[in-house]
Amino acid sequence: MAESVFSCIPEDVVFNIFFKLQDDPRNWARLACVCTKFSSIVRNVCCKTQCYSAIPTVISDLLPLPPSAAASASSSTAADSSLTPPGGWASLYKLAVCCPGLFHAGILLENSDFGLERELGPDQNLDPKPTTTDLALNDEEVSKPVGSGLETTSFWSLYDDLYTDTIPAPPPEDSIDDQEEEIETSEIRPGRDLPVRKRRKICRSLGSHLASGGWNLSREQGNKLLASRFRGDCLYICNWPGCIHVEEKRNYMLFRGVFKDFKRSRVWRTINDGNRSKTSGLKCAFCLCDETWDLHSSFCLRRVFGFHDDGEPVVRAYVCENGHVSGAWTALPLYT
């Protein structure tokens, strides 16, 4: 029904409306869920235009013009329309404005937990209680729980995170005070145990969400991440400190980025030639790639960052075959 109604609207009118809503990326996320026509416009026109506007330097480096196109301005315009970044314009735009979230940054992986589950609690206890709106969305197969890695591959799947970010959720049944850290206030007396500190109940966004801070990418920041032998590779990541997630044990500064010509980079050769195993259960936060590689275990990151006393690396990062990077910084240990 929606297809037949909106197909009658002239495209110039649709474009005019869409670009008046470009200040908040979540507006396009909502519109992409209306019909396939709107989804196609958002993916192929709006995202491309906004990428050229927001990160022009990155685009010019990721998509260099061929010599024939650079010869004349008229042919370069036509050449631009035929060039597409790995993963598509929608994934690049999502990378520019979205934080990968705790799950896609690898912090909640079971095989690299480093004791975090004891501090944060099991993953299933962190999920908010489903609202009526969420249940309706699940029934219509619009999306799966954010961060679960089970998102649908429908035409709006790239926007599930932003769309879910806009759904107003009523306050939970428990009071706000119950969500704060509960500490036993009884007096310490001889012969009695010390007050027990109960686990904090936290409801956090595990998946991708609208990033805080500036929506730009910098090659200088990427150079600070890679080991010295990979300095010839071009990695753009968001400016420091990225999107800050405050946790009970330590703060995580989540970042995202993209490699230029990833399949021709030295990082990819190291991963491919070394037969590095893929990270189980961790998909890309920005495109439809189902597999990622751990740059830390592949020795592609600077060794100077080191580890915390519980074995957790100070910096971790994961890359998909399209060159999209998700990761997290933490504060350096004091003993270093």
Swiss-Prot record:
Domain of life the protein comes from: Eukaryota
One Pfam entry name: F-box
Pathway where it operates: Protein modification; protein ubiquitination
Any GO MF annotation of the entry: ubiquitin-protein transferase activity
InterPro entries: EID1-like (IPR040267), F-box-like_dom_sf (IPR036047), F-box_dom (IPR001810)
Keyword Nucleus: yes
Record-linked SUPFAM superfamilies: F-box domain (SSF81383)
Annotated motif Nuclear localization signal, positions: 197-201
A GO biological process held by the record: red, far-red light phototransduction
Keywords in alphabetical order: Nucleus, Phytochrome signaling pathway, Ubl conjugation pathway
Compartments, as annotated in UniProt: Nucleus
A GO cellular component entry from the record: nucleus
Domain F-box: 3-55
Effect of residue 10 to A: Disrupts interaction with SKP1A and SKP1B
Coiled-coil boundaries: none
Function: Component of SCF(ASK-cullin-F-box) E3 ubiquitin ligase complexes, which may mediate the ubiquitination and subsequent proteasomal degradation of target proteins. Negative regulator of the phyA signaling pathway that shifts the responsiveness of the phyA signaling system associated with hypocotyl elongation from red to far-red wavelength.
Subunit and partners: Probable component of an E3 ubiquitin ligase SCF complex. Interacts with SKP1A/ASK1 and SKP1B/ASK2.
Entry domain remark: The F-box domain is required for the interaction with SKP1A and SKP1B.
Miscellaneous: 'Empfindlicher im dunkelroten licht' means sensitive to far-red light in German.
The protein's name: Phytochrome A-associated F-box protein
Organism encoding this protein: Arabidopsis thaliana (Mouse-ear cress)
Organism lineage string: Eukaryota, Viridiplantae, Streptophyta, Embryophyta, Tracheophyta
Name of encoding gene: EID1
